[in-house]
């Protein structure tokens, strides 16, 4: 069985993330979405909320599993016999950082990293940008799945 992982914080998941996950799900038999736990960062959504949102928006693919992870991604991969990491690249600045990570990961464990160019529609998109625009009342309906838009609006009304 061909397996891959799409890692990230996904706070929240965007249409750009979803595009990469969707494309990976067509290339691999099983795709894990690994939601990073970073206790040093306070996210807008708790990890379990992010996992729930991702499960909802990836359910139609049928071969996507969503789990949290803490620590080294290569350890997550080793525990699940995952030989490949799939990463979307938006710009040259992404490539510089991701190449360093890919070289470290293959050196640590032999896990390969495959870079997927981002759909140009989403080349500017990040979770941080989505949160910033949403905080100030901007229209983000075209940037996130409807269930995420609803969750964001609800969360921002509370805060």
Model segments located where?
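Nucleotidyltransferase catalytic core that binds NTPs
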Residues: 1-159
């Amino acid at each position: 069985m061909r397996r891959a992982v799409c890692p990230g914080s996904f706070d929240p998941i965007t249409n750009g993330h979803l595009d990469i996950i969707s494309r990976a799900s067509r290339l691999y038999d099983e795709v894990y979405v690994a939601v990073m736990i970073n206790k040093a960062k306070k996210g807008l959504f708790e990890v379990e909320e992010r996992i729930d949102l991702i499960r909802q928006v990836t359910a139609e693919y049928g071969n996507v599993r969503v789990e949290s992870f803490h620590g080294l991604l290569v350890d997550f991969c080793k525990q699940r016999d995952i030989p490949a990491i799939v990463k979307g690249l938006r710009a040259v600045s992404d490539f510089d950082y991701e190449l360093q990570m890919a070289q470290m990961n293959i050196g640590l464990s032999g896990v390969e990293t495959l870079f997927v160019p981002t759909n140009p529609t989403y080349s500017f998109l990040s979770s941080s940008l989505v949160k910033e625009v949403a905080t100030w009342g901007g229209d983000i309906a075209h940037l996130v799945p409807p269930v995420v838009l609803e969750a964001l609006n609800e969360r921002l009304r509370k805060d």
